[in-house]
Each structure stands twice: as C-alpha cells, then as structure tokens.
C-alpha cells in the first residue's frame, strides 16, 4: 500500500501495519500474553489483522529467572538431568504370534505424569521395531498360467469395524484347508517344489542384481537394491554436509545443553531493596546500565500476579519500551502501541493493573510516554489507575543540571509526570562489584580544515535541486518549506510509525543525500565523502523500486556529478614497510591504556600514523578526527578478546566508517560492522540488527560503529573499549554509552576537539550532573515535599483541542491528528505509480506589531470523500497543521470514512462478518468444509396408506391411489436381445404428481448403441383393498430385494410413510380400468412360491470365484480383487465365507460342494428322453428354461438362460484361456468343477446351459459408454467372448423371477431417482413462488459429481457474474462517499461463498441438492433398507512412506486422508438418509439458481430469487442519489480530445465529467477531478456480466469447463489492456507518473508487433505483461457509459461489442501454456516440476519433466517467467515427439518384429521354453501424487539353470512402464547368457 508524503513525508507501503508499531515488523505479537478479558470494554476484533510472531526467547528467559528466584526458598535444587543417551539403532524384533502382537499393542504403558500440551505432538523415542512387509500373491499360476507378481507394501484392509476399527497387524493371512487336487498328481510335492524355488529366489537375491548405470550400461551390484539405495542415500547425505546420524546426535546434545540449568542467577540485594519499595508505591528505579532493572520489573510482575491470583482477580500488566529494538529483549509493546490502543479505545487505562516503563526518562514533551500519562493516566480516577514502575539510568534526559535545585526541579517534573518517586541505592559497593566503572580517557584532535571549494559546489547543487523542485510544482515557497522544515515528518514517524517514502519526492530525497555528503566532507574528509556518494549512487542503481519512481534519472545524474567531483584515492604504502612495522609493534606492547589519561598518544604511534595517512590529512582527504580514531584503534591491536563500540551521531558516519577502516591494511585485525536503528532513512531491519549483534557476540565482528540505538536496551556483549567519536548530546547518552564498557579494566574514550569550549563545558557538566543526580535521588524518599509544587502541566481538554466519540470513547487530539490523516491517506486504494499523501498549503498573515499568524489548507487525495479543507488561523505553522487535521478527522468520521474507533473504515458495513473457526478447521464456504445433511424427500411422496396391512392396523375401506405406467422408448438399435426383452411396470403413488414431472423425459444409457427415453404416463385413479395392497407390497419387496441384493422378509420389513410408492407389473395391453392392467397372476405366483425358502434365491452371496475372468458370469470389478465385504481375501486354494449381502451370514466356512443338494442317477435316462433336465432342486422342461434366471449352487451367482446347447456336455474339453499357449489346465468341464469347486458332476451327459451373468443394478442416468459410435458389427464378437458361460444344469436352481422382469426392474431405481429429484425441484419452485420450469431448477440443484447429463456449472457461471454486477451496482449507488477499496470489501462480504452458504442453510437448500453419483446399492427403496457399497476407499500408503509410531498417529493420518479425498455425497457408513456436502457446493447452488432464474425470466426473475434467498441488493427509485455534479476546470476540459473519444466509442457523453473521471489516474495531482477507481469498480462488474451473458447464450452446448475458459480469456485485465492499445485509449489517460509512461510505451510497442502478425490474438496470453492501468481505464469507461446512459446495460454492450471484436471463440481460445503443459504431463504420466529463483529484478523459472530440465525463461514478473518457460518446454516436447514419430516410421518394421522387447516378448519366450512366468516385484514406490515413480524388478526360473539374477528397471511414472523397463533389462541378460536366442530360435 502506498503511503503519503506532503508536509510530513509519505506514508510507507506497509503503513497499515506500521500504524501499530514504530517501524516494527511484528506489531500484533506485542499484544500476545495480555489478558484483555480483564477489561469489559475491550474488543479484540478492533485490532487490524496482520502477521504476528511471538518472542519465545523472552518468555523462556523470564521463566528461567523466576525458576532461579523460586529456587532460593526450596531445600535443594534438583540435580541436573543426565545427558541424553544416543538413540539406539532400530532392531527388528522376532515375529510375534498374532495374539501376542495385539496384546503388546493393547498394553502399551502410559506415563502417569504425562502432560497434554496443546499444539504439541508427542512422539515416543523408544526402539522402533521394523515390521516385515507382507508379500501377497496375486493370481500366480501353478503351471505358468497367468504369471504374477510379488509386490511389497500392501497393507491389509480394515477390519469389519470400519473406519474406526482397529487395524490388523502385518502378518500372513492364515490359510484355510486346501481343496482337492487340481491337476498335479502330488499337490504336496508341488508345494515342496515351490518352497525350494522360493529358497533359491532368496538365495539369488542375496547374491546381487542387475541394473543400468547413468550411461545406460548394464551393471551387476552385490546385495539387494534396497541396500544399495540406502548406501547411495547415506553417501549423498555425507556429501551435503556430514552424516545425518552425527547431525542428529549434535542436535540432541544441543537440546540437552539448552535444557541444562544455567548457573543460578539470584537477585542481588540492591535489586530486592528497590523491589520492596516498588511493591508499596509507584517507583522510578534510578540505576546504571547493566544493573539489572529488567529483573526487578519481572519480580514485580510476579509479585502483583501472585496477589491478584489470591484475590481471584484477572490481571493486565503492560511493559512499555521506548524503541522497537527493546521489544525483542524485554517484551511487550512500545509506548506508541499502547497510546494508539488507548486513543482508539480498544482497551481502557482502568483495565491495566501494572504499567512498567523502561527508560522512563523519555517521558518529556510529546513523547508517547508523556502522552500516555497525560492523556490517559492522569485523567483516570486515582482508585482506577495502574501501579507504575519506571526504570532509567538517568532521570534527566538533557544536557545536564546547573545546580542541586535545578536537578530537584527536573526530577520533580519526571516524578509528577509518572506519579512516582525516584529511588536509587545508597550502598553502591555491591553495585560496583557487579557493574564496574570503566576508565574514562579524553583524546583531543585538531580542528579539520574546510574544503571551501567542494563545499560550495555541493551546496550550489542543493540550491539548484530546490529551485527545480519549486519550479516543477505549482506549490508556493511556504508549502515547500513546510514540507521540509515544519516538523511534521518527525511527528509522523513518532506518532504513527508510518515509514516515510522520501523517494516519492525525488528533490527532497536528493537534498537529504547532498546534505549527508556535505556533512561527511566536513567531518570525515573528502575520501569518506566520496565513499558516501558512491554508496548512494550504487544503492539507487540497484534499488528494485527505482523503475517505478518519478525522479530516478534526475537523482542519478546529480549523484554522478558528485562522485566525479569527490573522486580520490587513499593509499597506505608506508604502513606496510617491514622495517618499520616490526619495531612499531614491539613498541606498542610496552604501552597500556593508562598512558591515554592525559589525552595524548605515544609519539611512536603518532609517527607511524603520520606515515600512513599524514599526507591524506594534509590534503583534506581525511580529517584529524579520523586520524585520531585510527591512532586509538592501533593501540589495541594486540589486546586479547578485543571488543569495541564507536558511538557516532549521524547514520552516514556509521555507514561509512566501517568501509574506511576496512580499506586500511594496518587495521586488518579489526572486523567492523554498522549498527543503526529504525528512525532514519537508511533503516536497518530488526533481523539484520540482531544478526550484527550475534556476530559481535561470537567474535565474527569485533568493532561496532553504532548510533544511539546501541546506548540502551540492546543485549550487547560487554566491551573493553567504548569510543565516543561524536560527543554525547545529553547526560543520559553520556551515562548509557559509558555503561557499555562493563568489562573489568575497560576504557571509555571521549574524543574532544582541541580548543572547543562547548565540548569541554559539556563534559564538565555531565560529570557534575551525574553526581548531583545521584545525590538528589538518595535524598528523595517520599513525595511529601512536593505538596503544592507540582509542575505537571494540565492536559488541554478544550473543545477545539480534541474530538471524542461518545459511543466508544475513542479520541483524536491535536497531537495525533496529523499522523492519523497520513495513516488514512496510506489506506486509500493506490498502486505503485501513485503514492497518496495529504498536502498542506500554508498561508501567512502579518499583524501590526510584527507578529505572524498562519492558516493551513489541507488537500486530500482525489479518492478521498472530500478533497479540500481550510483550517483556522493559528499562532504557528505546526499548530495550523494540527488544527486542520483535527477538523478533517472529525469530518471524515461524520462522513463514515472513520469507524467509531477513529480508524479508517475498510468496508465492513454490509453483509455478514466472517466467522472465526477453530484453528486447523476449514472455513465455511470452502470446498474442504464438509458436513452431514439429511437427504430430502418430497412432501408429495408421503403417505400413511403404505402402513396398511400391519399387525393391528384395521381399515375396511378402499384405498384410493394413483397409478402411473413407465413408458420406455428406445432410440437406436441393439442386437442384444436382453436389452429389449423387458417386462412392463407401473408405479403407484398416494398423491397425484405434478404435470411437469410427467412431461419430463429421462435418458437411460442402457447400451453402447441405444438410449432409452423413459417417462411416466398417468393411467388413472385406482381403488384397492387392504389384502390387495399387502400382496402388492410383498411383490415389491421380493422384486427390490433381488434388484438391490438385500435379503429381506416382506412380513417383517419396516415401511416409512415419508416415501410411499410401489412397483407393480403390468401387461402390455391397455385397459380402461387401470387396476386390471396389473398382472395379478404373476404377482401371486411370485409372492406365494416356496423357492424363497432357499437363501441363495433371496440374495446373492459374496463369494470368491477364483479368477478374474468375466466368462464365469457376474461383475469382474466386484470380484476381481478377491475381497469380501468383511475385509477377508482368499487365495486360490482357500474357501470363502458365504455371506448374504445386506444381512448376517447364514453359512459357516464350508466347501462349495456342501451347498449342492444330493442328486440321484436313477431316472436320468427316462427324463432325458422326455426332454427334461435335472436341475439342482428339481427337473425342468428344457424348452421352459429359455429366458429364466438360474442360480449357480456352487457359487451363488445368478445367470440369464440364453439357450440349451445340446451339442455340448460336461465331458467336452475345457476351453483354453485366451493367449495361453501352455498345457491344458483342465481336461473337461467336469474336471474343472471337480478341481475348482470340489463338485463331482453326476449327469455329465446332460446338455450344458448357455447363460449370461446377471449384473448388479447400475446407474443408468450417467453416460457409461465413452464410444457411442462403436461399430455394430463388433458387438456379437465381443458378446460371445465376454458374457456367455456354459453351466451344467445339475448345479443350477431356477429362480422364481423371470429374466425379463428382473431386467425391467433394474431400470426402476434410476427412473425413480430422477422422479424424486424432479418432485423436489417442483416443491422448491412452489416455495420460491415464481414461474420457472422445474427442469431448470433441477439443473441448478444437480452437481457435476452426479455425473449426469444435468449440471449446475454453466448456470453458476452466469449467476456469479449477474450477482456480482447487481451487488456492485447497489453498493456504488448506495454509498457515493466510499472509495473503491471499501466497496470491494463490502461486495466480497455480500457475495462470498461463506455468506451464500449461510443463505442456503437458512432456506434448507441442502435438502434439495443432488450432489452424489447415484448408486442403486445405497438407494433407499420403500420397504427395502439400503446396503453399503462394497467398494473400499481405504487408505493404503506405500511402504516407502514414513512409518507411523503409534496407533493414534495411524488413525489420524487415515482421517486426514479421508477428509481430503472425500467428495460430495460420499459417506463413510451404511446410510442413505445422510450425505456429505461441502459448503462451497451450497454456495454454488445459490449462484446457479440465480443463473437459471435469469435465463428463464430475466432480471425480474433473478432479482425475485435473490430477494427470496436473502440478498437485498435493490434500491427504490427514490433512494438512488442524483448524479454527482462535476465542476471541472476549463483548462482540463480543453486538454481532452472529446471528439476523438467520441469517434472511438461511438457515443457522446451527456455528462462529460464522467468521461474525464474515467480517464484520470490517481497519480494525477488533484484538481477537482476524482480518479477512475469507483467507475472501474462498477465497470468491471458490468463488463463481466455482459461478456458472460454473451458467451452463455451464444455457445449453448459448450461444456462448463470450456465456457469458463472462454470467460477467463475474454474477461481479464491483459485482454482489456490490449483493447485499450488497439483503439488508442491509452493516449487519453491522464496520469502523473513517468514510470507508468515508460511501461505503457514499452507495452504499446509489443502489442503493435503482435497485431502485425496475421490472425494473431493472444486474448491476454501475450509475452508482455500489461500495465494494470490500461485494463482499468477500459472498465472505468464502461462504468461511465453505464452511469451516463441512466444505468442501461444495453448501451454499454452496444459500445463495447465492436471494441472487444474479435471476441474469443472455442476455435480461437488459446490455452495457457502452464495449463497445457500440466494436462499433457498428466496424460503422459510424466512428473512436472517448476523451480523458481530470483536474482535482483529478474525471476528465473525452470521446467523439469521427469527430473530433466526442458525449459527455462527469465522475466521481471515470476508469473510471466513461468508462462514463458512452460511455452519453451512445450516447444521442446513437441519437437521431441515429432522426431520420435519420424524415427518410429523409419524403424516401424523392426519395432513390429520379434526384436521389440516388451513383457509380452518375455512371456512368449517363457512359454516356448516351458519356463514359469516371470516374477515381478515392486521395489520402490514414492514421490508426490503428481510425480509418482515406480521401480520394479523381474526374474525368471530357467528350470535348467535355476533363477536368473534380479533385474531392476528404471523409475517410471506407471507400473506398466516400470515392468517393461525391468523386462527389457532381463531380455538383454538372457541374450547374453544363452548361446542360442532366448526365443528358442537357433542363431
């Protein structure tokens, strides 16, 4: 945020934060630890939000001190903790049995004294046992069948307890008894062979493995891949800086050292003496620097705290410090922070119990200490005032005292101000023991000769710059002098801490630099002045902000002249002569610092220095003072542990002296650095200051050149030398700087100019004043002698001196008004081209008698509520400024620009405020914030009639119901007869459905080449008896139990009246009586059959089929993983648990043959001759089986019977697997069933049944077929291969439901899903009460996660734009005085997702939303409970992830993963009545509803919906304010070419003031014209709405994603900026920034080059970053047209449609290079990574794909550099793809031949040589989700030579590629090891 300049200088970029501290970076943290609850008036929300950071070091230090104090009363200190033992190396314990493992986990000990610390994760540090990962076989064929793989790291599934259940330990699953033999004569022998092979596998593994080195060559490595990987990782860690174990050990030792108690620091006697007095009364502790005043304050806090705790009261203690650096040592806040808090009434003075003031001598004049006491402490009743404790090294902060009486008066003033008594110690022996006094030495130097010529030339430059500044601006002499000398700059920094941006005024900044150079020239010499000028010039050239400042070139040209003028060199040749150096060093050792008492250096050193720089002193290159300093420093070149501080007055001296001293070889023993504070132009950051102090402490720096910042507060190491290069200005500075020399035997050297009377007088007064102050303090024991002598000046509380808000108590006074106005200007919206600040225009009035008075006119920036205000006539310039600023503050508060706390209003007047969530929880309105909501059911479906027929329910009357038939029309054709052979159904409801529901046609995606359009047709009203209803209900339950696979009993199933309807079968013929259309015969047969007694007929058992083939029927996806619903997986030789889905298992673990009923061979020949077949439970006529459903007794699967194959029986050979060339596994079908299921077929001569599996009920509303244009000719071939299976009749049970009935019923759940959704939409439509089609409302309620043909995303896009426009228009018109920043924040609070989410909850929209993909298994049909979908979503982390160290941590990681991965609608339990919705979904639905209402009914309908939802954004006509009058100067009107603008826009403005405002930038000096920011605010919303509407209605079939891309390409600042350049709107821009002019010129040049390219239009994706201002003026012109046309958006579109031409289209839509590269890498499964770095003003971005750099780009903007780098990477990848394609074309024949090495090639070799299939193993899996990498190994058993060596492939982005890489390596190994070709062919 830019700041203000004006009289008081500019406000800084971080003015908002700086307001709360004096140039401090972590201001808000200063309030941490304060119990604001002690004040009932405190409102924490009033403190502005900012980044905070607590000073943990200080808190730890206080704890340590208090512990040491408490230790005095304890019997004996606790022994120090033993040093930590080295962490033992993890050792894997032996594998425990399952029961022992579980017991071990359950009985983990918990420490009794464990303490739970919030925010701290406690980890156990015991021995961590490594668990051996389980290896699980997946389909490994016994005879080389299908191959297989060994893959480590697969964790077991969760137990049946679900998410919250315990995890299973890592162990091998207990194997169940094996089935009968299946092809080998000796199965036990086969297992022994496998065991031997595994042993050989591991033996070979221990030998080594093959892999490729970096050059691509095959290399053999010993051991395993994991061991080699660990060795490489350790080598890499060692190269990076040592062993990680050593580093960890060092960290542990360091932590132990830190935790070890330091030597006890006990309070000294004199500290306790002062403490006792402070406990009884307000006290000012007068003690030397280093005497431990802070400890006394801490002890006082502890004492008061203990007292308040005993009284059960809350305490608020405030520790104040005068400067920011002190905060980092002694807490809590600077005085300015407390002053601001009190002034803005955030807390009250009576809420503070203890007030501690460090360095309290600053409480004079207008210092914050003084203002806190005078404005708030003394105005508070005495009984409510806090206790005060002040600390100082000198109660008088002046040049000294003249007498004992003068000293007493000054101390009285301080005591009165602080309402305290000065206290010091009388016995100084203990103090002198701990704080030794240094030896004070005076060194005199000669006065410097003045270089008049150079001085005059620099002064002349200063005068020239000042005159140029005056001539370039239209300000008066008084105005400029006021800006420079009125003193407001100091007040601004002191009061509000707003960093002054003097660069904003290039002339004033340059004058300051020239004055600093001139000072260095006179005080330090020409050489030093040259160094200063050179530093200024270098800093200016390297400053990143220099590109955006107005007068940079102007400053640079003058500084170059000064550098050339002062250029000189300084040599030190004489000092390096060896013949003199040795002698001088020896002589130096003979002297000590005692020789300096007389103020003269030994002659030998004087001669030596004269040889070194004597000529330079004579020439004026170095002054005698610098020469004397060098002499002093040379005296200490052999001093052991030398530490020194040189105190200087000016910052320029502190900056240049280290450079001077560093260039003198004779002072090479010194390592010098600067230490400056914050209150200067060359600010030193706090982190840099602490770093310098740290270096000084550990010896990397031995000499500090410091300003007054080092005099007090900072924790600087004890020094043995302190040099006052510039004499102190006050007694306090004299005492405090001396206190830095606390080391025994140290020297305090004062440098005095020879013959300077003022220097000698000050030194004499300082010495006398110190003694006088100490004497006076000892005599002051109470305040009784002060009665009637108080000199405290009363606070000016006259009405004109302050302004107070009655409601809050906030106050602004003359002292704070100027700073508050500057702070307000810094908070106004601005950019880097405009630095907003107030301007003061002074008017002088001369009165008779020679007196002068002044008045001040205040001019605020152009985007303030008012621009000019004239103040009253006052006696001084400063008072005139204060008076006008105070009046401005009052006016701003009355206009609403200030809140009631007198802080700038940020725009919180409209909408709901942001709610604060607990830490770590996602905020409402975000996608991650999810909650459970009940599923909505339409009220029309409710019916008590569904409860008829229950026990005890008597009703003899007819029940009146409504019947609707399901009408299905097929679109397209299909050769599959099962798709079209369906039964007809009707649905019975208790209420009549809405006509819109009947008119709705839903698409059911039943086949790849056919879609069924279903709808409901009203058949009529029916009346049925209770007995008929019971029969229909039983049929409904039986039907749905089969469709949904739920085992329920019609007599016991519960019915819910909230959802009352029934499915009934109907005949094909229509009848006049709809009741007769029901197929009652079918209903009776199905309900009354005895077949339901067999559990296999009621629901499908969950069994493992032992294969992944779909030829056995059923759903491959469901059974392919061999996992049952209870989390149990089985191998090939295991038997499953037969569990009824949706119910409790009724069978134990048994052989499959146990379910097959007993059969008899007796009458087989007779029945065969009669055309009957022996089924599992009865005999059936073969002709009657066609179309029926049969249940396989051996597996529990159900099948549709297609036909009877009389030419096949069970003795036919079993078909070979596709692609398998090995020996036959099963000789016949009978052999297959015997080996596979243990079933011995009896009727082997019976013909087989050709059947197709009955699939689960599917979601037919979602398009399931990607390729709808598949060739119909391919269907029959795929059908035969995929779906048909041949079953022996004796293993089949005939199901009571016909096949056509089941297939027809499987469509009913999808149909009712859409019907129920439509009923909810109709219900919501009736509630909203506006005629909009219910189908449109349903579209707005359906999320994309449903994966249906309906989706709200397009409507949401339109509704979002319309909502933004309506709210923007409302705010713009309602608040004409608020600026653009306030309006933007208010709009955000009205349209944010969090607010819309609350609106949705208020209207219970969560009950109407369809957000989950329809799953029939979870659908709640009437009378049938839903079941949980068995697809597991468990989290299976890789073994290469970090192992968790406890059960709690494992559960937490799973929960986090589930939260992140869960989508809308997904639930974690068995429930269909609740679903999970993100709060963002609810907010999106609100916008989508606005969109559909706008489409259906325009603005009126959309506004009606917004009003219903709770968004009030309409103004009554009488509330709309009249147009703002414009009084634009004639000179401005003449400067604008209105005719040209009329030609470009095609419209003439009625109010030309709007157009002038639309093209005026904030950098333009205010002259009665506002800037365009408010017009840009409303214009941005208008254009966004109009362009979005155009795209929405133009491209009606465009998917939401593409429509969003079109909108983003059309509505962006880059595109608008190019529109401005294309139509030359930029030439009319009124601004006052040369930097902006340069950027516009460069951008125009680039755009003109782009436009020359044929057909080129980047739509904002060009290579040149556009200045935001250009896009802003396009939006502001749109806003001006909108207002000038009477708020008519059609006029705006009429103007801008040709301006925006050519509009982006789907064909011309450019994809952002970053997105294009991201999508390409995702499609190719390649890892993408960006690495960014910055060097100066240039950002560099590198692009890596799979770890290889393929693109790089540089640009000042990081985003632009990323875009260019992505574009370069795409070019490289496309060129690479083209080259690869050409190479493939050239070598196509070779690649298509036998030499193309893949896994298939390796499999073919194994088949031909009759080897077992290759064994693959995953050896590594890691990396982030977007850059996953897999490493696989492979080996093969060659039978004759045993196992091959393991071959490790390269890291690949997919498992397939990783296996291929390993296979290629193994093929190369086989080619090398076998003399003949591996494929079996002889060479």
Swiss-Prot record:
* Residue ranges occupied by any RNase III domain in the UniProt entry: 1320-1498, 1538-1686
Residue ranges with Pro residues bias:
75-96
Q: What class of enzyme is it?
A: hydrolase
Site (described: Important for activity)? 1668
Q: Which terms are listed as keywords in the entry? A: ATP-binding, Endonuclease, Helicase, Hydrolase, Magnesium, Manganese, Metal-binding, Nuclease, Nucleotide-binding, Nucleus, Repeat, RNA-binding, RNA-mediated gene silencing
Residues forming the Dicer dsRNA-binding fold domain are 817-912
Protein name from the UniProt record: Endoribonuclease Dicer homolog 1
Upper lineage ranks? Eukaryota, Viridiplantae, Streptophyta, Embryophyta, Tracheophyta
